[in-house]
Amino acid sequence: MLDISKIAIGNTTNYAETPADSIRVSLLTCSPHDEIYSLYGHTAIRYEDKASKTDIVVNYGMFSFKKPFFVARFVLGLTDYEMGIQDFNDFCYEYQYFGSQVTQQEINLTPEEKGELLKALQDNYANARVYRYNYFYNNCTTKARDIILKSINGKIEYKNAIDKSVSFRDLIHGCNANYSWASFGNDLLLGFKADMQTTREEQQFLPDNLMRDFGQAKIVSADGSARPLVKNTEIIVKGNDHAIAGKTKVTPQFVFITLLLLIAAIVVAEFKTKKRFLWVDISLLLASGLAGLILFVMLFSEHPTTSTNLQIFILCPLNLYWAIYIIKNKRNERKLRKAWTFLSIMLCIGLSGRLIQVYAEGMPLLALSLLLKNCCNLYATRKND
């Protein structure tokens, strides 16, 4: 790991007096590759000084899976990422290895602004290298954007229009279209706040969106003069067609359609044999209850879009209690009717929530499967009472 503090800042007035400015600052945008963590791309800053033969990449996306409880901390929004400094050639080699494209946009900064940016990067590296990662609001892309824009003496104006009707969920769907199970996992954990409209700045959490906006932006100085934010754009690492894998055949939709048909067959078998396969109900309650515990934990996550998730009425942690309740009262029709009634009401609420929240693929089918089984059980308790 390189150390940015070893790069001399110099006096910003000297920058203005330098006849040939040897410093270039660029935004690097990396396309996705086949690893799940890379599906949304990546952003970094290149700092190049030909006079001192310095060529480094400032990378706000450094993390380690080996840290204790990494997955649990990530889910709860307690993950710390780190600002790292890499050799430019090493950085490019990594993305070339994965087959990702790297696009470079040279930022049109004045010598004074370059000096301010370097000071900010050095201060960031020395005093705030580790930061609390937030997927939508504080990630490698937003960190790079913010530190660049804060160094600019002027107002940023964007020439391109954006679709303000899109939500965070819409944006990530565009990135994981080939990964149905990754999309399912995201949609399962995100609440209805992820379906709200987004601003331009919010949409810039995705590297491609920031690259697009920077390419269409200009800097307006206090005297009214304007200059493009990006001086020039070039592809410095070419990608290949194998970076992203194809779609999987076994999708969540397929799995839940199969489950619905299986439960329908079990219901028919119960009516024909006049027997109840209580082990099926207990298995469904335990499985949905355990999954519901994850949604319950997400209510306390620091991620801003997970605190209100109506899918918890379908995958409900209370199902664990009702599984035990039904086992204890399996011969008491009145108490069983109470259980099946409550469970059916919860599922109806969950299905109604689909009107205001986008659910994970197949979740309505899962709710219908569970509701079908519960309603048949409810009918049986009334008939036998």
Model-derived features with residue positions:
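Glycine-rich catalytic cores of cysteine/serine-nucleophile enzymes that process amide/ester linkages
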Residues: 21-99
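A general structural signal for short secondary-structure junctions and capping/turn motifs
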Residues: 17, 36-37, 48, 176-180
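Intrinsically disordered, low-complexity boundary segments flanking structured domains
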Residues: 10-16, 46, 89-94, 172
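Bacterial Sec-dependent N-terminal signal peptides
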Residues: 1-16, 383-385
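A cross-kingdom signal targeting lumenal/periplasmic-facing segments of multi-pass membrane
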Residues: 64-154
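Generic structural hydrophobic/aromatic packing signal, biased to beta-strands
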Residues: 27, 45-47, 58, 105-109, ...
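Activation targets extended, charge/polar-rich intrinsically disordered C-terminal tails
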Residues: 123-325, 331-335, 343-385
